[in-house]
Amino acid sequence: MIRSATLPFASALPSLPDNHRLRLFSGSSNSALSQEVSRYLGIDLGPMIRKRFADGELYVQIQESIRGCDVYLMQPTCWPVNDHLMELLIMIDACRRASARQITAVLPYYGYARADRKTAGRESITAKLVANLITQAGANRVLAMDLHSAQIQGYFDIPFDHVYGSPVLIDYLRSKNLADLVVVSPDVGGVARARAFAKKLDDAPLAIIDKRRQAHNVAEVLNVIGDVQGKTAVLVDDMIDTAGTICEGARLLRKQGASQVYACATHAVFSPPAIERLSASGLFEEVIVTNTIPIPEENRFPQLTILSVANLLGETIWRIHEESSVSSMFR
């Protein structure tokens, strides 16, 4: 079930005037989310032809005049990431050639974000390459949610709005009135994210799962830094991919005496064997994610809760269009 989190945002905006220049188009990767955003904004999705030729090439044609318009292109670059990325680039190019005044690429999920630096010789920094492609295609601005690496914003020489799914996740957790809460980072790299999350939850205590290898060819040892005994642990991450890290962390928290374990993440990548790990492990009371990436019915399981970020994205798009503050949404 997808729950719409309306707080702290309105359920819909006031009606736009007939002569407004805001246009919203959807790629094929998450049309359901795009429809929700369009309802929040009170506008229809722009008409567009998308098709694939027999040889696999993609084709896009905008079906209305967008000359002088402020155009927003919704396209999370999730699986199949290369097809969805290429479709986004073609959409941007089509809008540029149609004389749009401003083109904003809206990426609720930014694929290739984990390839943000070289970890070995002769590697590509693919997150930077994607930034170059989006810019060169003709985007004037990018709007993305919960980047795996915040420094990706610096890969762009155009305005970049980085928004967070935490208001939606936190609002839902507050509604559950969980007692003895402790926010847990599944690794040292996620401490800043977990700390900010804990602060919004009435300064809840913070714990960290620390991985360290004692010697070469020796398995990693996991330690919990912080007190979780008898507490409700909320594991917070930007994404759940194969679910190995978060299940490993939950298992350790249970061993250390946590009474309940919840998992929270913005992006449900859910690469195999994530569904089997999350649903069959019995480790989690609830796995809470958002709908930045579509989750097919066959990948849903009883412990899964999907929260909608449509209102948050819609409000952000409206504020950008109206040249209002975006950062004030997250204070």
UniProtKB/Swiss-Prot annotation:
Species per Swiss-Prot/TrEMBL record: Synechococcus elongatus (strain ATCC 33912 / PCC 7942 / FACHB-805) (Anacystis nidulans R2)
Entry keyword set: ATP-binding, Cytoplasm, Kinase, Magnesium, Metal-binding, Nucleotide biosynthesis, Nucleotide-binding, Transferase
Designated name of the protein: Ribose-phosphate pyrophosphokinase
Annotated active site: 211
Cell compartments where the protein resides: Cytoplasm
HAMAP family linked to this entry: RibP_PPkinase_B
Binding-site positions, Mg(2+) 1: 148
Cofactor(s) needed by this chain: Mg(2+)
GO MF annotations in UniProt: ATP binding; kinase activity; magnesium ion binding; ribose phosphate diphosphokinase activity
Cofactor note: Binds 2 Mg(2+) ions per subunit.
